[in-house]
């Protein structure tokens, strides 16, 4: 199941989405094993997207979700009111949003959509359960989850894992927990 806001087939071309999906709901190592996943691709292979493409993905989720639904946004943007408005509209339609808190070591309240009060915004901890030096922080972080050396499906292999770092990997742990809670 995939929607590609870039007009492609939804395939992951760098492994980020594969890792995120595997952490949230992978059949072997996922938090919510077996939960239904829809790939909503908003980043090209270069890794840099546009706000309009991200908005297209959020709007697609809003229009096509089946409740209960969780949208994991392992992405971030500088404060963008138009993105915040789209996510708020999606939340009102019944989608729970989990967002990566950011990897800049700064105030998470400067990032969209994680700064929204109804978004579960996730920072990253290390092996000692301490906030990493690079994880964003502040009153807009809802909670922390492991974000260092997180084992996730390896994009280049059907049988091995790769270790990932970042709030992008912490967020799907929380998304998986929310899926278990909501029984998605």
Which role fits each region the language model picked out?
Residues 58-82, 100:
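Short acidic, glycine-rich surface-loop motifs adjacent to enzyme active sites
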Residues 81-97, 112:
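Catalytic-core regions built around general acid/base machinery
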Residues 95, 111-183:
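Extracellular S/T/G-rich loop segment that most often corresponds to the catalytic His/Ser-adjacent loop
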Residues 17-25, 51, 55-58, 84-87, ...:
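Extracytoplasmic/secreted envelope proteins and their assembly/folding machinery
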Residues 1, 8-53, 65-70, 91, ...:
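Subtilisin-like serine protease catalytic core
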Residues 11-16, 46-53, 75-82, 101, ...:
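Extracytoplasmic/periplasmic, Sec-exported soluble proteins
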Residues 5-7, 28-30, 43-48, 75-81, ...:
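Solvent-exposed loop/turn segments at secondary-structure junctions
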């Amino acid at each position: 199941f995939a929607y590609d806001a870039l007009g492609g087939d939804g395939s992951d071309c760098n492994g980020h989405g594969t890792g995120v999906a595997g952490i949230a709901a992978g059949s072997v190592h996922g938090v919510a094993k077996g939960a239904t996943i829809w790939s909503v691709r908003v980043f090209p292979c270069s890794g840099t997207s546009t706000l309009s493409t991200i908005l297209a993905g959020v709007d697609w989720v809003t229009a096509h979700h089946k409740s209960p639904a969780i949208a994991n946004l392992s992405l971030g943007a500088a404060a963008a009111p138009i993105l915040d408005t789209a996510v708020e509209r999606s939340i009102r339609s019944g989608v729970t949003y989990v967002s990566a808190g950011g990897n800049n070591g700064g105030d998470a309240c400067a990032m969209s959509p994680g700064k929204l009060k109804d978004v579960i915004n996730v920072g990253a901890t290390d092996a000692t359960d301490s906030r990493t030096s690079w994880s964003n922080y502040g009153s807009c972080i809802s909670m922390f989850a492991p974000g260092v050396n997180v084992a996730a499906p390896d994009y280049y292999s059907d049988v091995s894992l790769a270790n990932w770092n970042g709030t992008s990997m912490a967020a799907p742990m929380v998304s998986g927990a929310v899926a278990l809670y909501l029984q998605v």
